């Protein structure tokens, strides 16, 4: 089931994953997590640092990449 949110989330998270861009993930409770996106699905993001953490998307407030991400490359993958 694809909705508008997935149409925005998936290309962004996939670009971060493919390019191994370091990210800071801020949770709704204010905690900051850092690492690389290892994988993701509709409900969770796997964040890799010294260990792999499974972070539920409903707990995420903001994803901040360490550098700019080119999303135009994602249209070629489809």
Curated annotation (Swiss-Prot):
**Record keyword Zinc present:** no
Which residue range or ranges hold the Sm domain? 10-69
What Gene Ontology molecular-function terms does this entry list?
Answer: RNA binding
Q: Name one GO biological process term.
A: regulation of RNA stability
Q: Which CDD domains match?
A: Hfq (cd01716)
Q: Which Gene3D superfamilies match?
A: 2.30.30.100
In terms of superkingdom, the source organism counts as Bacteria
Kindly state which keywords UniProt assigns to this record, in alphabetical order: RNA-binding, Stress response
Look up the record and report any one GO term of the cellular component aspect. cytosol
Q: Which family does it belong to?
A: Belongs to the Hfq family.
Q: What does this protein do?
A: RNA chaperone that binds small regulatory RNA (sRNAs) and mRNAs to facilitate mRNA translational regulation in response to envelope stress, environmental stress and changes in metabolite concentrations. Also binds with high specificity to tRNAs.
Subunit record text: Homohexamer.
* UniProt xrefs under NCBIfam families: Hfq, PRK00395.1
Query: What protein name applies here?
Result: RNA-binding protein Hfq
Q: What is the lineage of its organism?
A: Bacteria, Pseudomonadati, Pseudomonadota, Betaproteobacteria, Burkholderiales
